[in-house]
Amino acid sequence: MSTEQRDRPDRPDRPEQDEQHGRTTRLELADQTLRDWDATVLAATDDGIVLDRSAFYPGGGGQPPDHGVLLWGGVQTRIAGVRKSEDLYLLPVEGDPLPPVGTAVRGAVEDARRTALMRTHSGLHLLSGVVFRDFGALVTGGNMEPLEARMDFNLPEVPERFRDRVAEACAAEIAADRAIEVHSMDRAAAFATHPDLIRTATDLLPPDLEVVRIVDIVGLDTQADGGTHVRSTRQIGGLEVVKIESKGKGFRRLRVKVTGAG
């Protein structure tokens, strides 16, 4: 990882810590490398399985939910998704057994899928940072699957050599091996410290959100974000701009693929 650091004023960060959703302590945001853990079943119904502790990312911000398994008493329950409601419900594959309430289980996130999504999510932050820095365009939409994604921008005209310039700039930022840091701040302090914190054309932060989680590609891009990320731009691997499409007057869609080993 690059030793490049950016001089910053002292910022009132909150230490990264596990987040609570309903009865479940979410483990994946404070430790994005965590792939397996012990937990206890609090509920198992047609709505899904509720654990006291979980590292399954439930989806959000364009990033799909994790897949994985629960292991208990020599039995395996495959998890095909996660649903956020008053609790965090793990959605088992149809026909798989449900562990009884009180059962001790070992949870395991599917590593290949999660790692691919982390690389893709960080790649989209890098892409939006480059397009904002070099062309002043904000994000108007986006979506991702493992190692491929789309991102829409409010870009009235396509600049000369736009595709090549974006691809070259992204490659340079990956080669620079910029650190990708995550921290949380009180909302007022976050916007005072980072006036350009929202890189979307519409502010999607809930108005009652008091603490903002921030993902910082050091020296390039700082955004409010609730997803999972790799630790440096080099870990993205490569970012190929596959296609540029017009999505109506003033809007462009970039389709990208994440390449390489990361």
PLM region spans:
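Active-/binding-site microenvironments in catalytic and ligand-binding cores
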Residues: 1-262
